[in-house]
Amino acid sequence: MSDVRVGVIGIGYWGPNVLRNFAALPGVEVVAVADRDDRRLREVRDAYPHIAVTKDYADFVRLGVDAVAIATPPATHFPIARDCLEYGLHVLVEKPLALNVRDAELLVDLAERRGLTLMVGHTFEYNPAVRRVKQIIESGTLGKIHYIDSSRVNLGIFQSSVNVIWDLAPHDISILLYLLGMEPLTVSAEGNASIFEDVHDIAHIHMKFPGNTLAHVHVSWLSPTKTRRMVIVGSEKMLVYDDIADEKVRLYDRQAIPLASAAPGDTRCHYRYGDSVALPVDWVE
């Protein structure tokens, strides 16, 4: 099978990482890069002399590109992805797919009609620690999932093109959907623009899933510390996934168990404080 010929659009903040990883990936040939900035294109040409550079991603068709990776500012994702799908190219776009539901649905419909792959860069679905958490949930070790509480906060980086929900929450929401394997019945959110008017820098997102499973996502650009933590509470055990800690996944044998002799309205419980164990994670992706 011949290599997949890839073009990368956008070599700003995140694009160089996309380019570097595709260039090192077996079965992939990066044939072109598009960006509006001459300096960035010169840097790509110096580092990768064999890769064509252009200011216009429409040139990708002439250059024989099969698929594109889009790493441009979020507001440009929809028009660029739409153009590339219309060119007949498979598309990987960094999160978010679009800035509203209508545009996202249009892209999905276009990809389906053209028989093309449209994929969003929800990289945490391929993170070994997250996959380990999913294994634990599916094994039944945690029992019925009562709720998941997720926090992704830090100080900055403020952006004019997106608010904190579009910047950070796609990670947590994609992880939740992956872990639970279902979509929420209801979603609500509230936030605040504390520093710049009309740019929300803190938000709380609430979701209710089938089976009365609740989820809460807290995202913020206005926190003194950086946190990447998800607490999962089940009817049998509890688990913490901490992307910053050395021990990414820790299982807690803890629970509140109503007294068997308790009468209706009696909320006395037996609290089990069992061991906590750091679970091994296979870091081969």
Explain the meaning of each model-derived region:
Residues 123, 236-285:
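C-terminal glycine/acidic-rich active-site capping loop/insertion
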Residues 55, 93, 118-120, 149, ...:
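Hydrophobic residues in well-ordered beta-strands that form the structural core
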Residues 32, 67, 147:
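Short, Asp-centered acidic motifs that coordinate Mg2+ and/or phosphate
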Residues 75, 98-160:
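A contiguous active-site-proximal alpha/beta segment in oxidoreductase catalytic domains
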Residues 18, 48-109:
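Beta-loop-alpha module in the N-terminal Rossmann-like domain of NAD(P)-dependent dehydrogenases
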Residues 121-128, 153-186, 199-201:
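Mid-domain beta-loop-alpha active-site segment that forms a flexible
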Residues 173-254, 284:
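Contiguous beta-strand/loop segments that form the cofactor/metal-binding neighborhood of enzyme cores
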Residues 1-48:
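N-terminal Rossmann-like dinucleotide-binding module
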